[in-house]
């Protein structure tokens, strides 16, 4: 099960490209209108990078912007250092299947975060990416083992265990 990036409803089933609740339809970034891009990126500060977008941070109040279950838009390829840290009411995060990089402390201090699936496309995770995520008991990763590009201390100050070769449901 995955979450719709527009409405956050969990009924956005894997393998489908549209949401039955809000009529969102997943399209390649080249086919999105400026308004569709704005709507998807509304809570985030971002910049365009080769092949997609990098989330730099959260606009306004982190506690109001990211709460409960959140799906990162499908055209985001990088999450910058400290970008989503201190979002204390963030519980679940769905990372896009083409995400390449998670920066240092990107999700640090997200104390309610309990559900993360890391897609196999992620070739870099920085130091302390999930530091002080106290509710995070298990991190599911699609990779069969820790990729070379992941910092040896990516789980610094995080007691979660990693389930390798996991499948996103």
Model-predicted regions and their roles:
Residues 1-2, 16:
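Residues immediately within or flanking Cys/His clusters that coordinate Zn2+
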Residues 12-13, 27:
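Short functional micro-motifs and their immediate structural scaffolds
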Residues 22-31:
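Short Cys/His-rich micro-motifs in 6-15 aa windows
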Residues 131, 152-155:
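A structural signal for leucine-rich repeat
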């Amino acid at each position: 099960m995955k979450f719709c990036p527009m409405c956050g409803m969990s009924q956005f089933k894997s393998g489908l490209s549209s949401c039955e609740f809000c009529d969102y339809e997943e399209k390649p970034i080249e086919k999105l209108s400026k308004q569709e891009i704005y709507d998807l990126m509304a809570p985030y500060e971002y910049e365009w990078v080769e092949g997609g977008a990098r989330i730099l941070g959260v606009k306004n109040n982190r506690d109001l912007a990211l709460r409960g279950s959140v799906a990162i838009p499908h055209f985001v390829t990088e999450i910058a250092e400290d970008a989503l840290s201190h979002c204390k009411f963030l519980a679940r995060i769905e990372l896009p299947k083409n995400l390449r990089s998670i920066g240092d402390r990107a999700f640090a201090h997200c104390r309610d975060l309990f559900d993360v699936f890391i897609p196999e496309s992620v070739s870099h995770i920085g130091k302390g990416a999930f530091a002080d995520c106290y509710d995070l008991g298990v991190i599911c990763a699609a990779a069969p083992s820790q990729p070379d590009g992941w910092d040896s201390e990516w789980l610094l100050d995080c007691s979660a265990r990693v389930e390798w070769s996991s499948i996103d449901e």
